[in-house]
Amino acid sequence: MTDYKPLVIEQLEVMEAGEAGFKKRAYTKAIRSIRGMTVPLTDAAQVKDMDGVGDKIYKKVVEILATGGLAAANRIKEHLNVGGLKELLGIHGVGPVKAKELLDGGYKSVADLRAALGGKPDLLNPTQKLGLKYYEAGIQRIPRAEMTAHETALLSALPSSLTGVIVGSYRRGAANSGDIDMLVTYPDAMTDKAASTLFVSFVTALTSSGYVVDKLVSGPKKWMGYVRLGDGIPRRLDLLLTPPAMYGYAILYFTGSDKFNVAFRKWCLTRGYSLNEHTLTPVKGGDKPAPPLLLTEEAIFDFVGLRFVRPTERVDGAQVVAK
């Protein structure tokens, strides 16, 4: 029994690389669903009702299983350097439009860009230049043990009156992560200005210790850049200072997973509320009152009528269950 999953994913990834905007996101979602299959893919009917697999993508899967390939993918390979496109998209700050612009200019790889940048400094913006500098590091996953070491380093430097938590896949218990995302908050009695001052001092301490190796964005409430433990691999770090009133929403949103978040937001809409990383608001034109102050994830789950789900169990919409 042949498992066509690797072939289907490879062909759809070619299509994904050749698209932008909502079409690209459609392929991304379909690929994620198919990759998550726990059984062999032997019949196209298995993917028909999967999240992200619409009629057009389903027909492409049928073609792949019937012919061993996808004519549209072959055409993209002929007209686009797909391998190069994917490599260029791996550079932080380089999106589909910029990647195609570079390809059209004859730059088909990271090596091409590095060779050209000295004579053409305007080829990339500052963010893209740092992405190029740390390209090899950026495409490597971060093992959980290393994530824990980063967590220890960050919390050790954090002022005692601030609270910090690493979110994303790490908080969900994943074996590895793509980067480090940390939310920082402060007591309700503390002013925003005082919290920002402490946040800046936190970043200054990280920089003085040698932990920070490069910065992308540095402000009173947000910092993005590259950090390193000792002589280890440079890693992407995002720090975000969040007001206490928004912290519960932020930690819920940034923990994920993407599928879980989508299902959670859809549920909220059925209850007459719109949810984002900042707050919960009544749907325009509805009759729901503004929610009370909800400071924790547990309070948000309870208010919208959902059973609380631990971060490690937030996989997809199957966990979004009424209490």
Language-model features: where?
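Double-stranded DNA-binding cores of transcription factors and transposases
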Residues: 1-36
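Accessory alpha-helical DNA-binding modules that contact the DNA backbone or grooves
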Residues: 23-180, 184-221, 234, 248, ...
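Preference for bulky hydrophobic residues occupying beta-strand positions
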Residues: 182-184, 225, 239
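Non-catalytic surface loops within mature trypsin-like serine protease
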Residues: 186-188, 229, 243
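Short acidic-hydrophobic surface loop/beta-edge motif
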Residues: 221-231
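Conserved, surface-exposed functional patches that form binding/active-site neighborhoods
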Residues: 231-270
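Acidic, low-complexity intrinsically disordered tails
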Residues: 307-323
